Amino acid sequence: MAATQYYGTGRRKTSTARVFAKVGTGNIVVNQLPLDQYFGRETSRMVVRQPLELVEMTDKLDIFVTVKGGGNTGQAGAIRHGITRALMELDESLRPSLRAAGFVTRDARKVERKKVGLRKARRKPQFSKR
C-alpha cells in the first residue's frame, strides 16, 4: 500500500461525489463542512457512514468529499458509492463484503422524463366517458 491517499468516484441520480480517503482519526468532511453540519437528516449521515461501519474503519480513516448536483438523498448515495470505491482501492479484500451489502453496484435509477401529451412521466390526463 504505497499510496497515502485513496480515491473513489461515486454517483447516484444526478449527484457526483469525489471521495479522498487517508489514514486518520475518523473525520468526514463534505464540501469543507463536517458531516453533521452538511447533512441535517440523520438518515443521510447514516447512509454515508454505512460502508465504513461495515468494514469497521469508522475511526481509522479521514474522508474528504467534494459533491455536486442533486439533492440530499442523491448526494448521500453518491458519497456512499465513492467511499466504497475508495475502500476497495485501499484493500481489495473488502470487495466481497461490500458487494454483499450492495454498496459496490451503482444505483442506475434516475427520474423518468416527462412525455408530451401526459401530465407527468406516466400520469395521463383524466379521462371522461361522458
Swiss-Prot record:
Q: Which family does it belong to?
A: Belongs to the universal ribosomal protein uS9 family.
* HAMAP family on file: Ribosomal_uS9_B
Name the gene: rpsI
Q: Could you say which residues form the signal peptide?
A: none
| Matches recorded under PANTHER family | RIBOSOMAL PROTEIN S9, SMALL RIBOSOMAL SUBUNIT PROTEIN US9M
What's any one GO cellular component for it?
cytosolic small ribosomal subunit
Q: Which UniProt keywords apply?
A: Ribonucleoprotein, Ribosomal protein
Q: What is the lineage of its organism?
A: Bacteria, Pseudomonadati, Pseudomonadota, Gammaproteobacteria, Alteromonadales
Tell me which InterPro entries the record gives.
Ribosomal_Su5_D2-typ_SF (IPR020568), Ribosomal_uS9 (IPR000754), Ribosomal_uS9_bac/plastid (IPR023035), Ribosomal_uS9_CS (IPR020574), Ribsml_uS5_D2-typ_fold_subgr (IPR014721)
Q: Provide the GO MF annotations for this entry.
A: RNA binding; structural constituent of ribosome
Entry's Gene Ontology BP terms: translation
Pfam families per record: Ribosomal_S9
Keyword Amino-acid biosynthesis among UniProt keywords? no
Listed name of the protein: Small ribosomal subunit protein uS9
